[in-house]
Design a protein with these regions (language model features):
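Conserved glycine-rich helix-kink/hinge and helix-boundary motifs of the Major Facilitator Superfamily
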Residues: 20, 53, 57, 88, ...
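Intracellular loop-helix junctions on the cytosolic face of multi-pass helical membrane proteins
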Residues: 1-15, 110-125, 129, 137-281
Length: 281
């Protein structure tokens, strides 16, 4: 039986737990994406540094476009499929896309491992775009559900905290498993990754997807989305934001004029660039 919100603004503990694991699949795959994508395509698939970087760039561009599209469309969606919640419907679409595409991103090209590199490039780019679309679906809708689950600031902070705790745990898990797998299978020189180590990435990928999928099942079974009409939910959200007089609803144009937006974006971008550059010699 799905746990429900015990009071309009208080989320039950089982519901908090179910919500907190709803982004684990994204966290696990994102950790592997940013940490090992360049390593895999350069050392395992034997792409050039430039080609590996282009695949990463394609993924990030697809992510940016998909995030914008899904952000607007998920808000405009009024009902979910077959009576399912509108946010959880988009989230489920994302899970299906991620689970169906991510394993192909970190495995050798099926029946085309000996094909020309340009053909393999197209093969991987196709699955990367699908993966990034699915990742954006799950990320946007999962975060959006916080405002619909509760209007109490303390409860929202708690949900965000639990969500972030699982993000940290997911990153640690990926690094720990990768360290164990590389240490066991890489031979004497554990820093030398070659195409012969493709099975390591295959094992890591299926481990990540398997655990992430289990958490997604917990999320979809364990959390009940609000049954209020979309218009009423949005109205209640606006009232909660403006009730104190401290917060005002911002348009996207005003949001782009906020300096904090660019500060956070630059810090995040340069941090990722430094991390990615250190992965491949």
């Amino acid at each position: 039986m799905e746990p429900v919100v015990s009071q309009p603004d208080v989320v039950s503990k089982p519901a908090k737990l179910a919500y907190s694991v709803g982004h684990v699949l994204n966290d696990l795959t994102a950790s592997m994406w940013f940490s090992y994508l360049l390593v895999f395509y350069h050392r395992i698939v034997n792409f050039t540094n430039a080609s590996s970087g282009y695949l990463l760039l394609i993924g990030q561009i697809a992510d940016a476009l998909a995030t914008t599209f899904i952000g607007f469309e998920s808000d405009r969606t009024r009902t979910g499929l077959f009576g399912y919640g509108r946010r959880k419907t988009w989230h489920l679409i994302g899970v299906i896309c991620v689970v169906g595409s991510f394993p192909f991103c970190f495995n050798l090209c099926i029946d085309c491992a000996n094909s020309d590199l340009w053909a393999q490039f197209i093969y991987y780019a196709m699955f990367i775009v699908i993966f990034q679309f699915g990742w954006s679906c799950s990320q946007i809708t999962h975060l959006s559900m916080i405002n619909e689950l509760t209007h109490k600031e303390g409860e929202r902070v708690a949900l965000n905290s639990f969500r972030y705790a699982w993000t940290v745990a997911s990153n640690i898990f990926v690094y720990a498993i990768a360290s164990v797998l590389l240490g066991v299978h890489s031979g004497n020189d554990k820093t030398d990754i070659t195409p012969a180590d493709a099975h390591i990435f295959r094992t890591l990928t299926f481990t990540v997807v398997g655990i992430g999928l289990f958490c997604m099942i917990m999320f979809h079974i364990g959390l009940k989305e609000s049954t209020l009409p979309a218009e009423e939910t949005e109205h209640r959200l606006q009232l909660s934001l403006t009730a104190s007089g401290k917060l005002k609803r911002m348009t996207w144009k005003k949001f782009l004029l906020e300096k904090e937006f660019y500060q956070c974006a630059l810090i995040w971008m340069f941090t990722r660039v430094i991390l990615n550059v250190t992965q491949v010699e």
